[in-house]
Regions:
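Amphipathic alpha-helical repeat scaffolds
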Residues: 16-17
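Small-residue-enriched hydrophobic alpha-helices in membranes
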Residues: 1-8, 32-196
């Protein structure tokens, strides 16, 4: 792997690794998607990077009793080795891929959307999607700590535009065991925040 390729790959590895934290990772989807879109890797390359390089290094964090929840430090030499010669570990993916599958599919979908926009506009779109996701996945009845009036006002127009296509993505990431967060209640909290 050349130094140029390594510089291009590092932000993608880091963003993808956020989907393996032992915390609420669905909030990371817009930021991971932006890094993927900015990288200029095509979908096939991103799929390989995720499953053949990052997944084998990062999945252990979700298999621990108390994994890292702030930031994963992945072995760069191992990532480089996998990038040069690795294959997708099908057995491990089959056994544990479900733990990150929904977030990864959402990341791929949002990556495709963000590619439609110039780099400077992607930042604002990412902020809007982040706000929408944080409000959506906040437990019912909780105040959304990141939805300050200033932050909402900054991205309100974009958030209203994006909500129609981001809501199904968020709904698809709700787990079967999240009965305390019915999809309609989550969506209602977002609509209230957006004033729609």
């Amino acid at each position: 792997m050349t130094q140029e390729e390594l510089l291009k790959r590092r932000p993608v590895w880091e963003a993808m690794s956020d989907l393996f934290l032992d915390t609420e990772t669905r909030w990371a989807v817009p930021h991971a998607a932006r890094r993927c879109a900015d990288s200029l890797y095509d979908d096939e390359a991103l799929e390989r990077i995720f499953w053949a390089e990052v997944f084998p290094e990062a999945i252990e964090n979700l298999l621990q009793v108390a994994g890292d929840w702030g930031m994963l430090t992945l072995s760069e030499p191992a990532l480089i080795k996998r990038a040069n010669h690795g294959t997708i570990p099908w057995l491990t993916r089959r056994a544990h891929g479900w733990m990150v599958q929904d977030s990864w599919l959402a990341t791929r979908q949002v990556t495709a959307w963000l590619r439609e926009f110039p780099l400077d506009e992607r930042v604002q779109r990412t902020k809007a999607l982040d706000l929408l996701g944080r409000r959506y996945f906040e437990p019912p009845g909780n105040a959304c700590l990141v939805a300050s009036p200033e932050r909402v006002a900054e991205v309100l127009t974009i958030a209203r535009e994006e909500w129609a296509r981001y809501e199904p993505v968020c709904r698809a990431m709700l787990g079967d065991d999240e009965t305390s967060m019915p999809a309609e209640g989550c969506a209602a909290a977002v609509r209230k925040m957006l004033g729609i």
